[in-house]
Amino acid sequence: MFFKEIVMNAVNASFTDYKVADISLADYGRKEIKLAEAEMPALIGLRKRYAAEKPLAGAKILGCIHMTIQTAVLIETLVELGAEVRWTSCNIFSTQDHAAAAIAASGVPVFAWKGETEEEYNWCLEQQINVNGKPWDANMILDDGGDLTALVHEKYPTLLDHIHGITEETTTGVQRLLEMWKDGSLKVPAINVNDSVTKSKNDNKYGCRHSLNDAIKRATDMLLSGRRALVIGYGDVGKGSAQSLRQEGMIVRVTEVDPICAMQACMDGYEVVSPYKNGVQTGKKEDINLDLLKNTDLIVTTTGNYHVCDSAMLDTLKAGAVVCNIGHFDTEIDTNYLRGYKWVEVKPQVHQVYRSENENDYLILLSEGRLVNLGNATGHPSRVMDGSFANQVLGQIHLFQEKFADLPASEKAAQIRVEVLPKKLDEEVAAAMVLGFGGVLTQLTSVQADYLGVPVEGPFKSDAYKY
């Protein structure tokens, strides 16, 4: 044999602090984790860089993020750097059961399986927080969407006395953090991982470019070429989604509220339209732009906002159209309204929603309006998630070393904030990713650096620079 055989997980029967769908999937998960590690040079580089220092020794992290193969690499990186973790998924459909099994088999407490009910999802969060009937002495939070952060603040506020900080992965969670900071309910500092360039451009844009069309094709087996799509929102997620559909040959239109994003869509060659006449969202069927919606084969929401695909739009949309969401929560599409109709499950996370007794009058709803690329497929590639998760690790180290919880009470208020990682750390993640692609960065000469007014080793752009 010319290669080293992968050592499979040996499940310790005495370890029971987990709940997954099928622990026997652990070996399968371990094989995929090894493949993912080869595609995640930034994370593996952090393991090597901090192997001796163990900067997270003493960290006890509550983690709530999609329990995927790529997340398994993140978890094991945190553990290798000294942390203890307890994990849940942030979405009822996004868990990859073999990934959860592999993590459980390695001795890490994890509570996640694909297809949880809302009640089971909440149960998992409670199991994560509580050990032997009382709250775990956690001192860090790693979140995606803000559910864990909200639960700790609202139900377990005494835990916050020991929490050094929160790192938040996604747009929706950052919005919630900013609201909490504004109204004074945020009690610890937080790092906005979402707006690191190596997260927002990789995950939000390039990741969605890869994974959206993959999810739709797996769910429907449809040829997308020549069909008409409406992308709601043209932020980074919307940009990647529009590219994803265009590269499949779809005719893509965009709807936007932000004139700058709308201008970008125009410059990128997309027609900017509105589902409502004159762009005024009244919620009334008589004000719907019928010419648009009756000629739309696919709607995808990308905004992180509320009811951007509302009941009036759903009732007037072309029969047989596909409706899906690649934002975080299921509130972008008014799925509660659709619950009043007859649902027929075609296969897991694919439903025909019949709007009348006419057998042809249905919509195809994917992932019940939740995150389609993880509900109907396997999400972003490992190489994309490498940047996001390297930022999470650096954010956890940054906040853990600040030791907010150890500050005198009189000094804490001034330290509560929501901020992005320093640009130098963002550039370090990017450099590791470039190296992973086999790229070679050119170094500035001292003369060039002086001319630009930047250090030779960076950071190379001001904080105001728009990538």
Curated annotation (Swiss-Prot):
Q: What Gene Ontology molecular-function terms does this entry list?
A: adenosylhomocysteinase activity
Cofactor note as given: Binds 1 NAD(+) per subunit.
- What EC number(s) has UniProt assigned to this enzyme? 3.13.2.1
| Residues the record lists as binding substrate | 68, 144, 169, 199, 203
Q: Name one GO cellular component term.
A: cytosol
Q: Name one Pfam family in it.
A: AdoHcyase
Binding-site positions, NAD(+): 170-172, 204, 233-238, 256, 305, 326-328, 373
Q: What does this protein do?
A: May play a key role in the regulation of the intracellular concentration of adenosylhomocysteine.
Record-stated family: Belongs to the adenosylhomocysteinase family.
Q: What is this protein called?
A: Adenosylhomocysteinase
- Organism name: Acinetobacter baylyi (strain ATCC 33305 / BD413 / ADP1)
